[in-house]
Amino acid sequence: DGFGYVKFDYNETLGLGVDGAESPGEGLRQVILATNELYAGLAKVLPNTVIELCASGGHRLEPSLMRHGHMGSFSDAHETPELPLIAAGLHRLVPVRQLQVWAVLRVEADERRLLYVLAAGFLGRMCLSGDLPALSEEQWSLAKRALELYAKAAPVLRDGRTHWFGPAVKAWRHPEGWQLIVRVAADEQTALVVGHAFGGVLPEVAECELPGGPWVVEEMLAETATAAGATTGGSASPLPGAGAGANGAATLTETAAFTLVGGRRLVWGVPGAFSAAVVLLRRA
C-alpha cells in the first residue's frame, strides 16, 4: 500500500446543521457515526498506518473519534500567543500522548520567541514546522537542546497527571498573566514543569507548590542572560519574531530559570512578556 501516515484535516464549522434527518442534531449524530465507521475501516485495512486527526474547529477532537486516531492536533499552523493556553486546556479532553502541538520555528525569531513555541511543544506531542531549512546554527542548537530534553520528558507526558497553576486568563486572543503547567509521572518519580508568561503587568516571579516531592532539578531550558535582559515586562509583541534577531548565544546560561525552595515550592524568575521556560524534576 505504501502509506505509513495519513492526516484528516477538517477545518469547517458546523454551520446551520445537517440535512436529511429528523433534526439537525440527529443528522449530525449520523454523520459522526459514519465518520467513526470510516476511521475504523481504515484501521482494519491499513493496521500499521498512523492516523492524525486535525480539527481547528475542535469538533473532531471528540472521544469517540479520538479513539480511532493515534494523534490529534488542534492546528498545524498556530503561531498566535494563545498556543500554550489551548494546548494546556486540551489536557482535559485529549490524552497528552495523543495531543499534537506544532512548534512553528521562524528564521526571524529571537531566542525568546523560539523558546515560547518550543516550550508549548512540551504540552503534548511536539512537532516542528516553519522555516526549518533556513534556521541559523544558533537557532538549531536551541531546537536540538529542546528536543533532547523532550525525549527525557516523554514518559512523563505519556503517563502522567496534569496540574494547572496561575491566574485566570480572561482573553485568550490577548492573554495577560502567566501559567505553570506541572505534569507528574505515574510513578511520581519525575515531573515536568512548563512555564509561560503572557502580556500585561507581570510579576517578577511566578511560583507554585509542587505535588509530591521533595524534588530536585534534573535539567532545564530557559533564556540566556542577553535575552532575559531584553524585555523585563509590559506587552512586547509576541508575533512572530518579537526581538532583534536570530543570532543569540548557542550555550544557555539560564538566568531566567527555576529555583526550588525546600524541594516543594517552585519559583520561576519571569524574564518578561511572552517568555517561557521548561524544567524536568526528579524525586530527591
Name these PLM-found stretches:
Residues 170-213, 278:
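Carbohydrate-binding surface patches
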